[in-house]
Amino acid sequence: MAPFPDEVDVFTAPHWRMKQLVGRYCDKLSKTNFSNNNDFRALLQSLYATFKEFKMHEQIENEYIIGLLQQRSQTIYNVHSDNKLSEMLSLFEKGLKNVKNEYEQLNYAKQLKERLEAFTRDFLPHMKEEEEVFQPMLMEYFTYEELKDIKKKVIAQHCSQKDTAELLRGLSLWNQAEERQKVLKYSVDEKADTEAEVSEHSTGITHLPPEVMLSIFSYLNPQELCRCSQVSTKWSQLAKTGSLWKHLYPVHWARGDWYSGPATELDTEPDEEWVRNRKDESRAFQEWDEDADIDESEESAEESVAISIAQMEKRVLHGLIHNVLPYVGTSVKTLVLAYSSAVSSKMVRQILELCPNLEHLDLTQTDISDSAFDSWSWLGCCQSLRHLDLSGCEKITDMALEKISRALGVLTSHQSGFLKSAGKAASTPWTSKDITMPSTTQYACLHNLTDKGIGEEIDNEHSWTEPVSSESLTSPYVWMLDAEDLADIEDAVEWRHRNVESLCVMETASNFGCSSSGCYSKDIVGLRTSVCWQQHCASPAFAYCGHSFCCTGTALRTMTTLPATSAMCRKALRTTLPRGKDLIYFGSEKSDQETGRVLLFLSLSGCYQITDHGLRALTLGGGLPYLEHLNLSGCLTVTGAGLQDLVSACPSLNDEYFYYCDNINGPHADTASGCQNLQCGFRACCRSGE
């Protein structure tokens, strides 16, 4: 209970409200996440409203209490001259208008907490002083009835301003979004007297056409786009427009660099210290134990910073994969994950699956393995790829190159050379009872070669070239089944060798080899299946020649037809593909313009597990006719023969940008640029110990 009668106690009731506001902002301050822009702005708006109410309270006291007391006592002066309210309001306004990013928010938060603590230390004693000093003076200089009248006026003034929202409008407080909206408004009558009249003749930013909003959004960085997506459903849909997300740099974004333009070509590698810092981040993140005791040492503090950076990177990647790429993945052209501390093969696999139209992929110095490319599981699934950098990816093997080559597709000109219609198909079907095979377990299920094409996954988990031991192969024949008249697989048990119709039986003699201009690979095409081709390809009888059919270990594919001039077929095919459906790779006819294997840049620097087998996998489907830059520095196990096979399939290769180990006697030895990894501290090189 107040020490003075309630009817004449002019301070206690208003001060109770002020103390309540102090408690509220202290509570909000302790719970606010200053890294979150929405929380940050909500706190500042709340503080601005609170301190405006403090200011209003001060003005009411000056006019109805202190002013009257000064008229009757000469000892009262400058009671509210140093309460810092104006300075605090100015601080909040600057925060609302000037703070743009998370880094500035965190710096501002530190200053804000210090200033609020100082204000609270002064404000609470100030109210106590008024209650204990000025209230007795009021009792001395004013009558009972005068004090009752003063209190009524003070309470009435406070209540009239109680609606905070109206108070904010009256004092022209607008948050940043409202200010922008106000600027964009146009009014028929600029001298409208009321807010209602203004709104009738104005258009806010939310009413702009989608085309205009999309143009505005194109100037925003990814962080700002994510904020805009939280404004409304309409803005959320616009922010997910693919054209706004063509270029992704999640590693840079996690470190505060929100660049999202086209990839820039850097001629210089980062220095060893920078690379070492990235490795330290990755190591600290992998070794981090959430349940470990906190170590306050300097070394621990450095590791803590590294862990924080890696965690931020992981959050950015997770957000992209689950919240952004499902909507915009088909529009993504550039993905740079170079020197990532947190990226994993699984993450890369998910991203590649969601981004089929990538043109620029940089995975430099990441800890990925072959499984990162498992999503490139069907032919031509990433045929727009022009730039691929796997420098320093030490876990990459030939299997990854096989998947990459498959994803690049097949040249249209390469297909047309040996995918020719063989006339009208014969109508006589073959029956399963006339055919027998020695063992059905040797032959995997054949895929139905229809024109569904690119929309379906046509491969199993094995790569293009999965060598299989030839020891278990008992049949000297390769069976070519008609694609449109396949028997039920259960009927295969009754098949016989006799009366083979609608099959092309090719004997795999030991003298089967390549003859450059007449190489059999030019006459064979089809979709890969797990039939006994793989077993034949493991035979020593097949010598490496760099062609898709002849490479040892290359899984050959089920054929639907062979050219009529082929000497391999003992019996002419009865059934062939209908006219107009010979482009079985893609399921539809394609234009004359090349759409596959357009790779211009390939770096495998430091990928020391790569062998000739992987290089030859890149020659499949027409080679790499547009490749200009090839870096094989640190690929220690490749040979001159393997390099020659690859170079022969890369007619556009520029010797100036062709790098390989100096110890290899390979092609263009006099004009190629040699190894780039000499005395390099973070890439594989045969001379790294020198």
UniProtKB/Swiss-Prot annotation:
Residues 1-159 are annotated as: Hemerythrin-like. One of its GO terms (biological process) is protein catabolic process. Gene3D superfamilies: 1.20.1280.50, nmb1532 protein domain like (1.20.120.520), Ribonuclease Inhibitor (3.80.10.10). Its main location: cytoplasm. Disruption phenotype: FBXL5-deletion mice die during early embryogenesis. FBXL5-null embryos accumulate excess ferrous iron and are exposed to damaging levels of oxidative stress. Simultaneous inactivation of both the FBXL5 and IRP2 genes is sufficient to rescue embryonic lethality. LRR repeats lie at residues 340-364, 365-392, 393-418, 478-507, 575-606, 607-634, 635-660. It is found in: Cytoplasm, Perinuclear region; Nucleus. Its cofactor is [2Fe-2S] cluster. Polybiquitinated upon iron and oxygen depletion, leading to its degradation by the proteasome. Ubiquitination is regulated by the hemerythrin-like region that acts as an oxygen and iron sensor. Undergoes constitutive ubiquitin-dependent degradation at the steady state by HERC2. One of its GO terms (cellular component) is nucleus. One of its GO terms (molecular function) is iron ion binding. Component of some SCF (SKP1-cullin-F-box) protein ligase complex that plays a central role in iron homeostasis by promoting the ubiquitination and subsequent degradation of IREB2/IRP2. The C-terminal domain of FBXL5 contains a redox-sensitive [2Fe-2S] cluster that, upon oxidation, promotes binding to IRP2 to effect its oxygen-dependent degradation. This is F-box/LRR-repeat protein 5.
